[in-house]
């Protein structure tokens, strides 16, 4: 087929279920070093990270991706083995084909071609890969970003290869992301027999008004760039499984996706104040996954729009929707961040795939973006 097809297949065949890398980064580093990249392997705990750079000085463009994948689930549910790439009906099937080994392969091919055409390019081209994007995201880009911050590393632009397209390659340009804040609420009650409720304190009954207030709260109206903040309860657990026992405790997990009108500390304070109004005996544990970020109108967005329109045939939708990405750790370094990648319809699903035509186009798309940012005068 082609270089990008072969490299994507090579990556898919390595079962790098998070936080495993399965040799993906070593193989990529060897290729990058052959064309003049300086490669640094940053290992934190069980996580592999690769920081590869070519050139020097400003501006600095980072291509950001991950080599880990989500578990495939039952192998028998797949039409073909998820770690044996298979080409069928114009698509390449395998775990990571769309999220995001196809993009990583395209990054490498685009970088190689760019350096052939522009060996003495201005500024710095960097590639940052991690094996901890799909998992806890603690020892991956989060930790690398802190290392880069301590070194005083400047980053001007970050291009993340997450599968951002909706129906066709390049139809959507991700220009920001909402923040993510998770919490686990533990409500204490008193266990007892359901026939003697006066001898017990049912934590479910006690918590229901507070949970109703939480889910009914109108946080904000959003704005032209971000949707409104939302809170969703994801898990509730209480009881022994018997229908004649009042539980002694309740556990509720919930998550907020919030726009820049809020910060994590403000949201935490608001929720604590709301819970305190209901007189619960509770504890609350928070996990801050990342603050929101937004790339304003400027050179990066303008060039990305022009390039995507060339490939998709129409101007892209510019969006801040969807979940989180590792760009949330790069944005606080002062970088403007966008996300451009293949269609996301099959990601994290059985029979994940990428359209072969899109895969073949990705290196050209990324190379043009790199050239417009680093080599255009």
Swiss-Prot record:
Pathway: Amino-acid biosynthesis; L-lysine biosynthesis via DAP pathway; LL-2,6-diaminopimelate from (S)-tetrahydrodipicolinate (succinylase route): step 3/3
Entry's cofactor comment: Binds 2 Zn(2+) or Co(2+) ions per subunit.
PROSITE patterns registered for this protein in UniProt: ARGE_DAPE_CPG2_2
Keywords tagged on the record: Amino-acid biosynthesis, Cobalt, Diaminopimelate biosynthesis, Hydrolase, Lysine biosynthesis, Metal-binding, Zinc
Protein's UniProt keywords contain Hydrolase: yes
Record GO terms (molecular function): acetylornithine deacetylase activity; cobalt ion binding; succinyl-diaminopimelate desuccinylase activity; zinc ion binding
Catalysed reaction, written as an equation: N-succinyl-(2S,6S)-2,6-diaminopimelate + H2O = (2S,6S)-2,6-diaminopimelate + succinate
CDD domains xref list: M20_DapE_proteobac
Keyword Metal-binding: yes
Binding positions for Zn(2+) 1 per the UniProt entry: 66, 99, 162
GO BP terms: diaminopimelate biosynthetic process; L-arginine biosynthetic process; lysine biosynthetic process via diaminopimelate
Sites where the protein binds Zn(2+) 2: 99, 134, 348
A Pfam family this chain is assigned to: M20_dimer
Cofactor: Zn(2+); Co(2+)
Active site residues according to the UniProt entry: 68, 133
EC number, as in UniProt: 3.5.1.18
Domain of life the protein comes from: Bacteria
UniProt family annotation: Belongs to the peptidase M20A family. DapE subfamily.
Subunit architecture: Homodimer.
Function noted in UniProt: Catalyzes the hydrolysis of N-succinyl-L,L-diaminopimelic acid (SDAP), forming succinate and LL-2,6-diaminopimelate (DAP), an intermediate involved in the bacterial biosynthesis of lysine and meso-diaminopimelic acid, an essential component of bacterial cell walls.
Protein name, entry field: Succinyl-diaminopimelate desuccinylase
Name of encoding gene: dapE
């Amino acid at each position: 087929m082609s270089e990008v097809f072969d490299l994507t297949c090579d990556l898919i065949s390595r079962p790098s279920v998070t936080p495993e890398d399965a040799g993906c980064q070593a193989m990529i580093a060897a290729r990058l070093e052959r064309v003049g990249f300086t490669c640094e392997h940053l290992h934190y705990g069980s996580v592999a990270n690769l920081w590869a750079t070519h050139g020097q000085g400003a501006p600095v463009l980072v291509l950001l991706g991950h080599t880990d994948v989500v578990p495939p689930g039952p192998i028998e549910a797949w039409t073909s083995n998820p770690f044996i790439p298979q080409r069928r009906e114009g698509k390449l099937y395998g775990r990571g084909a769309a999220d995001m080994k196809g993009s990583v392969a395209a990054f490498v091919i685009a970088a190689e071609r760019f350096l052939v055409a522009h060996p003495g390019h201005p500024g710095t081209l960097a590639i940052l890969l991690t094996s901890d994007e799909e998992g806890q995201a603690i020892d991956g880009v989060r930790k690398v970003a802190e290392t880069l911050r301590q070194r005083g590393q400047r980053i001007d632009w970050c291009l993340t290869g997450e599968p951002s397209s909706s129906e066709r390659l390049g139809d959507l340009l991700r220009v920001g992301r909402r923040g993510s804040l998770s919490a686990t609420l533990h409500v204490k009650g008193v266990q007892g027999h359901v026939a003697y409720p006066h001898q017990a304190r049912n934590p479910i009954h006690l918590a229901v008004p507070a949970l109703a207030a939480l889910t009914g709260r109108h946080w904000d109206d959003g704005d032209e760039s971000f949707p409104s903040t939302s809170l969703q309860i994801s898990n509730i657990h209480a009881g022994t499984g018997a229908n004649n026992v009042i539980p002694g405790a309740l556990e509720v997990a919930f998550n907020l996706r919030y726009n820049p009108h809020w910060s994590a500390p403000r949201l935490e304070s608001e929720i604590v104040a709301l819970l305190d109004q209901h007189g619960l005996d509770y504890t609350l544990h928070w996990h801050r996954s990342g603050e929101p970020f937004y790339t304003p109108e400027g050179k990066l967005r303008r060039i990305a729009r022009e390039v995507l329109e060339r490939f998709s045939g129409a101007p892209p939708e510019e969006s801040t929707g969807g979940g989180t990405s590792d760009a949330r750790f790069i944005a606080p370094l002062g970088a403007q961040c966008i996300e451009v990648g293949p269609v996301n319809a099959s990601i994290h699903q059985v029979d994940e795939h990428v359209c072969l035509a899109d895969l073949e186009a990705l290196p050209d798309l990324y190379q043009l973006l790199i050239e417009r940012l680093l080599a255009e005068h």
